[in-house]
Swiss-Prot record:
It comes from the Eukaryota. Pathway: Amine and polyamine biosynthesis; carnitine biosynthesis. Homodimer. One of its GO terms (cellular component) is mitochondrial matrix. This is Trimethyllysine dioxygenase, mitochondrial. Belongs to the gamma-BBH/TMLD family. InterPro entries: AlphaKG_dependent_hydroxylases, GBBH-like_N, GBBH-like_N_sf, TauD-like_sf, TauD/TfdA-like, Trimethyllysine_dOase. Gene3D superfamilies: 3.30.2020.30, Clavaminate synthase-like (3.60.130.10). Its main location: mitochondrion. Its EC number is 1.14.11.8. It comes from Gallus gallus. Converts trimethyllysine (TML) into hydroxytrimethyllysine (HTML). Keywords: Carnitine biosynthesis, Dioxygenase, Iron, Metal-binding, Mitochondrion, Oxidoreductase, Transit peptide. One of its GO terms (molecular function) is trimethyllysine dioxygenase activity.
């Protein structure tokens, strides 16, 4: 999923540029040759090798070729004087580190890198820690493991709902729910008492509620009490919410408390699955959608509600080091005037947007569900688009937004990668 793998990691030749090598290797020899060369932890072993350059250390370990700037190596020292292991915070003043610093001696054994600095301070790094935290290592990892889906994939997965009592009272139930949510971007809780108060208790099990211009917990009917198409009986096309916030709300909770009529099914589309298809078909268009910033806007003047919100960002948001998609900002209702895009890019942007929209609207990518009293739906608003078919009669939903950081925090505390 949008991870660029390093190719031919072990095919990099030794560089014969002139740098003075300092200090002993593995405690056996002192290298003073003027030509950079690889040094190994043992004569017969190629499991770990390193060489010094003018401003960085090059290390080959666990099939990964890594480069570490000397300032980085000094700044990230985990010694007691540089790092507080109790608070997991840096103690070293980074601004005090000489930007031209070089180690006085370097030694590597089977598990550890040792660096001695000009002032005599010794830094130790576990080789596995370096692999995990190197730029090269991070390029090969995903921040958030996911299963991308269309309707058929999701149905075949038979992802179970979690019982409300298990969700509220056991870590096992909560962990199962969060695992489903992290992998698929949606998750259901069943047997919830159909009241706003009980839905709030459910939501607060995993996160603080994010208060917005809509309040904390809200009732959702077709009375047009707010200046938004959602407060009608009309169909809603697929979209993500609060694109007009600088940081869109991370998670949305829906619970249908009552519906006396027909229609009103909820539409769910995995935006990341659609974006993956764009990446495969037209990578240049994917890149354009990830780089061109757009404004989204919400202007409201209904009753006592007066708001003017503006959020700016590209449709697709990716981590730059591994090209992993982490947020889709897609809402054609709230997209503002396009005035942040140069004339000669506008048509290419519309073409890319059309390609993405085509994927989002493919019938095979649409998962339709009927929300009923007692079944709460949690949606990753940074990933899964939602919509609604038109309906008749009285329909009442309640729900809220959750702070994404708190949901992910809960997941990590339960041992999940999030």
């Amino acid at each position: 999923m949008w991870c660029r793998r390093l190719a031919c990691l072990l095919s990099v030749p030794c560089q014969h540029t002139r740098h003075r090598l300092l200090g002993p290797s593995c405690g056996r020899r002192t290298f003073t040759a003027a030509v950079a060369r690889w040094h190994h932890t043992a004569p017969e072993s190629l499991s770990c090798a390193w060489q010094l350059h003018g401003d960085h250390l090059e290390l080959r370990y666990a099939d990964t070729l890594m480069r570490f700037d000397f300032v980085w190596l000094r700044d990230h020292c985990r010694s007691a004087s540089c790092y507080n292991a109790k608070t997991n915070q840096r103690s070293l003043d980074t601004a005090s580190v000489d930007l031209s610093i070089k180690p006085k001696a370097v030694r590597v054994d089977e598990t550890t890198l040792f660096l001695t600095w000009p002032d005599g301070h010794v830094t130790r790094y576990g080789l596995q820690w370096l692999v995990k935290n190197s730029y090269e290592g991070q390029k090969q990892q995903v921040m958030h493991p996911r299963i991308l889906w269309n309707a058929e994939i999701y149905r075949q997965a038979q992802v179970p709902s979690v019982d409300c009592q298990s969700f509220l009272e056991t870590d096992e139930g909560l962990k199962e729910f969060l695992q489903n949510f992290l992998l698929y971007g949606i998750a259901f809780v069943e047997n919830v008492t159909p009241t706003k108060e009980d839905t709030q208790i459910l939501a607060e099990r995993i996160s603080l509620i994010r208060e917005t211009i809509y309040g904390r917990m809200w009732y959702f009917t077709s009375d047009f009490s707010r200046g938004d198409t959602a407060y009608t009986k009309l169909a809603l096309d697929r979209h993500t919410d609060t694109t007009y916030f600088q940081e869109p709300c991370g998670i949305q909770v829906f619970h249908c408390l009552k519906h006396e009529g027909t229609g009103g099914r909820t539409l769910l589309v995995d935006g990341f699955y659609a974006a993956e298809q764009v990446l495969r078909q037209a990578p240049d268009q994917f890149e354009l959608l990830s780089k061109v910033p757009l404004k989204h806007e919400y202007i409201e003047n209904v009753g006592d509600c007066h708001n003017h919100m503006i959020g700016v960002g590209p449709v697709l948001n990716v981590y730059p080091w591994n090209n992993e998609l982490y947020l889709i900002r897609y809402n054609n209702y709230d997209r503002a005037v396009i005035n942040t895009v140069p004339y000669d890019v506008v048509n290419r942007w519309y073409t890319a947007h059309r390609t993405l929209t085509t994927e989002l609207r493919r019938p095979e990518n649409e998962l339709w569900v009927k929300l009923k009293p007692g079944k709460a739906l949690f949606i990753d608003n940074w990933r899964v688009l939602h919509g609604r078919e038109a309906f008749t009669g009285y329909r009442q939903l309640c729900g809220c937004y959750l702070t994404r950081d708190d949901v992910l925090n809960t997941a990590r505390l339960l041992g999940l990668q999030a």
